[in-house]
UniProtKB/Swiss-Prot annotation:
Gene3D superfamilies: Ribosomal protein S7 domain. GO terms for biological process: translation. This is Small ribosomal subunit protein uS7. GO terms for cellular component: small ribosomal subunit. It comes from Parabacteroides distasonis (strain ATCC 8503 / DSM 20701 / CIP 104284 / JCM 5825 / NCTC 11152). GO terms for molecular function: rRNA binding; structural constituent of ribosome; tRNA binding. InterPro entries: Ribosomal_uS7, Ribosomal_uS7_bac/org-type, Ribosomal_uS7_dom, Ribosomal_uS7_dom_sf. Part of the 30S ribosomal subunit. Contacts proteins S9 and S11. One of the primary rRNA binding proteins, it binds directly to 16S rRNA where it nucleates assembly of the head domain of the 30S subunit. Is located at the subunit interface close to the decoding center, probably blocks exit of the E-site tRNA. Belongs to the universal ribosomal protein uS7 family. NCBIfam families: rpsG_bact. Keywords: Ribonucleoprotein, Ribosomal protein, RNA-binding, rRNA-binding, tRNA-binding.
Length: 158
């Protein structure tokens, strides 16, 4: 095990919105250190989202943040071994981990989608998440369902 907890890295805000959350998302989206490409994908996806939801009074960034909130899980199950049996113990998730899980799920399910470009797939997944639909939202619902089903083992807290 580690001796000390590692220091959090300082993440700079993105150039367009000045938001650290956007940079964190783009870092998850990025392949092979190609951050500019990842930023282009993200910004074009947000433009497409605004085009798909023209009568929405929110900005594209607010829609993206609302979509992330919709797919953010509150509880997860962790395996815990007690006397030869393994139990799925529901535990609350730390705020930074919640954010990380929701971002990763949005990207994973966007990549699995059918579509021409990654920007199109990402925008479609953002719109679905905003409307409480799609693969990422279903993943959150499944996590909550698993935690609810295993609530009897909550006393095995970590």
């Amino acid at each position: 095990m580690r001796k000390a907890k590692p220091k959090k890295r300082q993440i700079l805000p993105d150039p367009v919105f000045g938001d650290v959350k956007v940079t964190r998302f783009v870092n998850h989206l990025m392949y092979d250190g190609k951050k500019n490409t990842a930023f282009e994908i993200f910004y074009s996806a947000l433009e497409t989202v605004k085009g798909k939801l023209p009568n929405e009074e929110k900005s594209a960034l607010e829609i993206w943040k609302a979509a992330l909130d919709n797919i953010t899980p509150q509880v997860e199950v962790k395996s815990r071994r007690v006397g030869g049996a393994t139990f799925q113990v529901p535990t609350e998730i730390r705020p930074d981990r919640k954010e990380s899980i929701s971002m990763k799920n949005l990207i994973i399910f966007a990549r699995k989608r059918g579509g021409k470009t990654m920007a199109d797939k990402l925008s479609a997944e953002i719109v679905d998440a905003f409307n409480n639909q799609g693969g990422a939202f279903k993943r959150k619902e499944d996590m909550h369902r698993m935690a609810e089903a295993n609530r009897a083992f909550a006393h095995f807290r970590f």
